[in-house]
């Protein structure tokens, strides 16, 4: 099985996005002038760039509803946005959420709010507003998304253009699937004969239901990345989300990202691959496969960066690869290559 067969075609999505962008031409001048970006968009604001990014939790919310456990999807909503904002070297400061729901119930919204609050606290941001829309004729269940505001001094923007052969790729491990690939994950559970309420098989995740493992919140990398940026000149930052390793060339398509010592994927990935009969290449271009965030620094800054990240992060931190001449991404152990 692959992601497209489960209902999500990432290549079709890319074409659709290009179609949308082809219709958008208006650009402001002066304050608010677009400054580009990759994971997040930037606009002119004096000596600063204001940074905006929008993302959602996706179909992970369907599992939350199935288990009637809504208290962590708010963390995911915050995480998906603040982690993207970090990728241009920006510090997240504020957030607005968007909740579309078929039948607003306080017992659901209160739990969603708990997760949003926890995510905001971890990220040190303020939730300053939002929108809750009751859409019974449009939506079945609910959809949760948000927008993050961040800022960065213009001379400290990180675009990835400084990435060069010889640089080192440092990885921070993920907590699991995070918030991407859930349409495929849910399809695997469906065809395998399991349910989200079943205990996880084969002795992994003792006592936990499959759905509980899948609801593990997305890691938030704000603290350790901001501390690193204070002390090290970072060449590139990548949030490993939908598209898996194919996220890396977004930073710089004129070099090759060689992953030669990646993280061991958590058991949830092995479970999905086994019962979904999913090929390695599809797994690594759909899921994060154990690595939630990547940092590219010069070889000279490797040890200093590792020391800082290990001090401030509760994630596993290690060198996962290096930058070579060429293009795209290579996962050396499995012989996987992606053009980006």
Task: Mark where each language-model region is.
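Glycine-rich, charged/polar anion/phosphate-binding loops
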Residues: 38, 130-134, 152-158, 221-225, ...
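Short, contiguous clusters of charged residues that form electrostatic/catalytic patches at enzyme active sites
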Residues: 18, 40, 76-80, 114, ...
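Acidic, glycine-rich loop-and-beta core segments that form the ion-binding/anion-interacting portion
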Residues: 165-208, 212
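Glycine-rich anion-binding loops of enzyme active sites
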Residues: 21, 44-49, 57, 76-77, ...
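Glycine-/charge-enriched secondary-structure boundary and capping motifs
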Residues: 2-5, 108-126, 139-142, 195, ...
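N-terminal glycine-rich phosphate/pyrophosphate-binding loops that anchor nucleotide-derived ligands
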Residues: 1-86, 124-128, 164, 171, ...
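Short, flexible active-site-proximal loops enriched in glycine and acidic residues
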Residues: 83-95, 282
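Short coil/turn connectors at secondary-structure junctions
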Residues: 27-30, 37-38, 45-49, 68-69, ...
């Amino acid at each position: 099985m692959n992601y497209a067969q489960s209902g999500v075609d990432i290549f079709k999505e890319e074409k659709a996005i290009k179609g949308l962008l082809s219709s958008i031409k208006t650009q402001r001048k002066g304050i608010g002038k677009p400054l580009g970006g990759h994971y997040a968009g930037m606009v002119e604001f004096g000596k600063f760039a204001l940074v905006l990014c929008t993302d959602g939790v996706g179909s992970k919310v369907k599992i939350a509803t199935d288990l009637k456990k809504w208290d962590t999807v708010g963390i995911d909503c915050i995480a998906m946005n603040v982690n993207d904002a970090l990728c241009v070297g920006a510090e997240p400061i504020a957030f607005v959420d968007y909740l579309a729901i078929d039948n607003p119930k306080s017992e659901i919204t209160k739990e969603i709010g708990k997760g949003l609050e926890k995510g905001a606290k971890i990220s040190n941001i303020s939730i300053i507003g939002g929108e809750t829309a009751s859409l019974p004729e449009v939506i079945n269940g609910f959809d949760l998304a948000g927008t993050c505001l961040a800022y960065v001094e213009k001379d400290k923007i990180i675009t990835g253009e400084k990435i060069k052969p010889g640089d080192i790729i440092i990885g921070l491990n993920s907590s699991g699937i995070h918030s991407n690939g859930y349409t495929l994950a849910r399809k695997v559970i469906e065809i395998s004969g399991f349910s989200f309420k079943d205990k996880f098989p084969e002795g992994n995740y003792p006592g936990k239901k499959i759905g509980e493992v899948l609801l593990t919140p997305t890691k938030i990398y704000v603290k350790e990345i901001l501390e690193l940026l204070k002390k090290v000149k970072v060449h590139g930052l990548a949030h490993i989300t939908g598209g898996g390793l194919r996220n890396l060339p977004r930073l710089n398509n004129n070099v090759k990202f060689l992953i030669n010592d990646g993280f061991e994927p958590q058991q949830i990935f092995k479970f999905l691959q086994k019962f979904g009969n999913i090929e390695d290449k599809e797994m690594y271009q759909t899921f994060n496969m154990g690595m939630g965030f990547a940092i590219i620094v010069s070889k000279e800054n490797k040890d200093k960066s590792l020391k800082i990240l290990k001090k401030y992060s509760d994630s596993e931190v290690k060198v996962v690869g290096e930058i070579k001449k060429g293009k795209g991404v290579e996962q050396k152990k499995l012989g996987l290559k992606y053009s980006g």
